[in-house]
Amino acid sequence: MHQASVGVHCPECTSKTKQKVYTRNTLPGSSGIATQVLIGLNLAVFLLQFVLFDATISDDGRTAQELADNGFFISEEGEWWRVFTSGFGHFGIFHLGMNMYSLHILGPIIERRLGPIRFTLAYMAALVGGSFGALLLDPLAFTMGASGAIFGLLGLLVMMFRSQGIGIAQSGLGPVLLLNLFISLSGFVSLGGHAGGFIVGIILGVVYFGADARSAPLFGRDQVKPDIATAVCIVVLFLGCLWAASRWLSAVG
């Protein structure tokens, strides 16, 4: 017999129970460190919008001119960093709040599966994918926000569930995806940004988890190649953004 915290247990009973050890990042309901850092960066950039650009609680004029994706400024002014800064700036506090709430909910679920480094790489790939989609569909528009990256997380979550044999209907993501599809088609947001991020999330989901429950991850058990593939994806998408931005003049006509 073995002494337990309450009474005693027989050896056969204790041998059947495997002890689970939870860490800060694997504790159910906990928020991963990378998710917290990304939320902090978004909040910091929003604060800078007030300090540097005199933005009001909902003003988007000066902020958009300085941070947002725009083909003319990226291509003609050489402001390539907009591909990245556009994913951290927001059009007002409501826009910021919606995206950060989504990141707070979705981020930890995926981060616990991928780990903080791979999760951050995937997030940035989806962010740049969103910039590519936005510039591809409308290179003259001023677009910004974390929505592209958030849609990338949705794509990753879809594939993560599929790898576990859980369909969209079973996972509860169906209504969420339909709602976001409706929002994307409403004309008030960047359809290209949402679609670009989501497609990147789906592709990375195949790399990390496999296409479905019967498929292995693209690189099997290799722990290095998926990260290299994600980094290459970011570079390719960034170059794609530069190309898409260069189309601004043709969009004028």
Identify the function of each model-found stretch.
Residues 1-253:
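A detector for small-residue-rich transmembrane helices and their helix-helix packing motifs
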